[in-house]
């Protein structure tokens, strides 16, 4: 399946607003401002197999994952750019799995910004039969954000990777 289009973000009444990603690591800041509408192309290629979907381009993100609020702020559903990268969705009688890499920025030699990507895993292990009236699950959620790169020349020791996770029953 192929999908294409345009993603638009426009704050009515705002003439200037920061183009900062509020979900990032604290030291990684954007200093630019945007005016008018924020337009991005949208493209998704999806291959569906028996119990696995492979998605490339704009991936299914945001609230589709069911991440807990400390890992994903629901306000980002309205303000964040669409996630782009690669995603694996799998479903079986004993597990639901969503694994992805959201590539926010790549770098070339002598770029003035860092490469940035987020890797995530959201799973739900099912402990009893799907036909059961009572269900017991063990969720596992992991989110890692990386900033830096092999050819990053901005400053020394500027590579950062932060990881957080949640397990429950």
Where are these regions (language model features)?
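Residues that define the transmembrane beta-barrel architecture of outer-membrane proteins
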Residues: 1, 35-41, 80-84, 113-119, ...
